[in-house]
Amino acid sequence: MSAVKVQLVPWTEKYRPARIADVVGNEEAKKKYVAWINSWVKGKPSKKAALLYGPPGSGKTSIVHATAKEFSWELIELNASDVRTREALQQRLLGALNTRSVLGYSGKIILLDEVDGISTKEDAGGLQAIVELIEKSNWPIVLTANDPWDPKLRPLRDLCELIEFKKIGKRDIMKVLENICSKEGVECSREVLSAIADNAKGDLRAAINDLQSLAMGKKTISLADLQILGDRAEQETIFDIVRSVLTAKYPEQALAVTRLPSLDYEMLMQWLSENIVYQYEPSLQAIADAYDALSWADIMLTRMKREQQWALLSYALELMTAGVASARERPPFKFVKYSFPEKLRILARSKEKREKFVRAVRGAAAKIHVSTSKFRTDVLPYLRVIYEHDKKRALEILRNLGVPEDALELATQ
C-alpha cells in the first residue's frame, strides 16, 4: 500500500526544489529575487511585494516554495483567480498577515498565484484588496503572473519589485529529467529526453508531467512511446501566426506573417483549413470567402510544385494570408483555442475519436473551472495514475466530471 502512495505523488511535487539555489535556470531573476528576500531578512524591504512574471513552468511558484523551506517560513498560498473578491481575500489573508507565525516557523511568506486572472469587471474590489494587503503587510508577499503588463495590474506594478522569469533552457530541462529518471529507476535515452524537452518548449513542469505519464507502469521509455504526447511545441509556435491571420484588422497585417523566416506555409495552410470555421462562425459569408481564398492558394501551390513555377509562391502566400483576412462579414474578434490539424497528427487517429476526446476534456475542464490545457497537464496525469491502480475509481471520477461513457477510456490513455 505504501508503494502505491509513493507512486501517486506527482513528480512535480516530489522533486520540487528545497532551496532557492536548486531552482533551475533564470540566474538573473534568482539574483534579483534573493536580493529582495534579503532586504526583508534585514528588516528593510525595498518593496513589500515582488511580482514574478513569465511563462508557465519557468519556476515562479517553485522559488517561493523553496524560499519557505530554506528560511523555515510558513507558506500561505492562494490562487488569486480562485479567491477574487475583496471580502474573500481579506477573510483568507488579513488575519494571517497581522499575526505571528505558527510554532516551528520563524516567519511567513505569502504567495498569490495568477493575479492576472482577476477580472476588474467581475471580481469586485479584488485588485484593490491586494493593494491594501500589500501596504499593511508585515511579511513578504509574492505575486505571480504570465502577463504583468495588463493595464489592470498597474496599481500592483507600482508596489512590487518586478522580476522576469524566462522559459527554461533545453539543457536544464534535460538535466532535471535525467536526475528524476535516475532516482525513479527509469531507463530513458538522451534522445528521448531531448524529445520530451523539445516538446515542453521551456515549460519544466510540463516536461516532468510528460515524463511521469510516459513512465507510468514501465521502467523503460522508448521513442515510440512519445507518440502519446501532444504536439505542444509546434502548436505554440504557430498559434500566434494563425491568430494574426484570422484576426487581422487589415489584409496588410495578415500578409506580414509571410516575412517570418521560420514560416512553414504548408503547415499554415493546414492550420488555417482546420480553424477558419471556429474563428469566423457564425458568419457563413466569412467562412465561405476565407475557404475560397485558401482553395485558390492550394491551387497555386499545386501548380507551383507540378510545373516548377516558383514565382507562384508569392501569390499563394498572399491568398492564404491577406486573402483569408479579406473575408466579408467577419464576426467581431473572439478568443478561439485553435485545434491541431487532423492531417498532421502523429498517430492516424480518426477525427471522430479526436473530437470526442477534446469535447470530453473541455467539458471536464469547464466543470472544475480550469482551462483545457491546464486540465491536460495538471489533472490528466493524476487521473492516469489513479487509473493504473484503481480503474473503477478513475472511471467514477471521470463520470462525475461529466465525461461521456464512450470517452471514458480515451481520457485515461
UniProtKB/Swiss-Prot annotation:
MF-aspect GO terms: ATP binding; ATP hydrolysis activity; DNA clamp loader activity
Tree of life domain: Archaea
Disulphides: none
SMART domains: AAA (SM00382)
Chain residues that bind ATP: G54, P55, P56, G57, S58, G59, K60, T61
Sorted UniProt keywords: ATP-binding, DNA replication, Nucleotide-binding
Swiss-Prot/TrEMBL GO biological process terms: DNA replication
UniProt xrefs under Pfam families: AAA (PF00004), RCF1-5-like_lid (PF21960)
UniProt xrefs under PANTHER family: CHROMOSOME TRANSMISSION FIDELITY FACTOR 18 (PTHR23389), REPLICATION FACTOR C SUBUNIT 1 (PTHR23389:SF6)
Oligomeric and partner information: Heteromultimer composed of small subunits (RfcS) and large subunits (RfcL).
Family as reported in the entry's similarity comment: Belongs to the activator 1 small subunits family. RfcL subfamily.
Name the UniProt record assigns to this protein: Replication factor C large subunit
Species for this entry: Thermofilum pendens (strain DSM 2475 / Hrk 5)
